[in-house]
């Protein structure tokens, strides 16, 4: 080892190794696929509690609801959604 070396493998040596690409050829596409399925199935909306794109407004409304009372905003929106 050279003086001042931390003992870690150089980055170039890691990315040119067969072992690195065997591992990452499986993990990188599977992470992408898992993320795609998480979003496309709607599970992301359920997990984070956000409304789905078609649930922002009621069918009879054409614009966003306006909240008039700052501290009563949630109750105003709850009344509107009933």
Curated annotation (Swiss-Prot):
With its partner (PsbF) binds heme. PSII binds additional chlorophylls, carotenoids and specific lipids. GO terms for biological process: photosynthetic electron transport chain. Keywords: Electron transport, Heme, Iron, Membrane, Metal-binding, Photosynthesis, Photosystem II, Thylakoid, Transmembrane, Transmembrane helix, Transport. Its cofactor is heme b. One of its GO terms (molecular function) is heme binding. The chain crosses the membrane at residues 22-36. InterPro entries: PSII_cyt_b559_asu (IPR006217), PSII_cyt_b559_asu_sf (IPR037025), PSII_cyt_b559_N (IPR013081), PSII_cytb559_asu_lum (IPR013082). Heme binds at residue 24. The keyword Iron-sulfur does not apply. It is a single-pass membrane protein. One of its GO terms (cellular component) is plasma membrane-derived thylakoid membrane. It is found in: Cellular thylakoid membrane. It comes from the Bacteria. The keyword Electron transport applies. Heterodimer of an alpha subunit and a beta subunit. PSII is composed of 1 copy each of membrane proteins PsbA, PsbB, PsbC, PsbD, PsbE, PsbF, PsbH, PsbI, PsbJ, PsbK, PsbL, PsbM, PsbT, PsbX, PsbY, PsbZ, Psb30/Ycf12, peripheral proteins PsbO, CyanoQ (PsbQ), PsbU, PsbV and a large number of cofactors. It forms dimeric complexes. Belongs to the PsbE/PsbF family. This b-type cytochrome is tightly associated with the reaction center of photosystem II (PSII). PSII is a light-driven water:plastoquinone oxidoreductase that uses light energy to abstract electrons from H(2)O, generating O(2) and a proton gradient subsequently used for ATP formation. It consists of a core antenna complex that captures photons, and an electron transfer chain that converts photonic excitation into a charge separation. This is Cytochrome b559 subunit alpha. The lineage of its organism: Bacteria, Bacillati, Cyanobacteriota, Cyanophyceae, Synechococcales.
């Amino acid at each position: 080892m050279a003086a001042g070396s931390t003992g870690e493998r150089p980055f170039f040596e890691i990315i040119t190794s067969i072992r690195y690409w065997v591992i990452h050829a499986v993990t990188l596409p599977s992470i992408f696929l898992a993320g795609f399925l998480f979003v496309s199935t709607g599970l992301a909306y359920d997990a984070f509690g956000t409304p789905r794109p078609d649930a922002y407004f009621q069918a009879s409304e054409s614009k966003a609801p306006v909240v008039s009372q700052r501290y009563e905003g949630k109750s105003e929106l709850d009344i509107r959604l009933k």
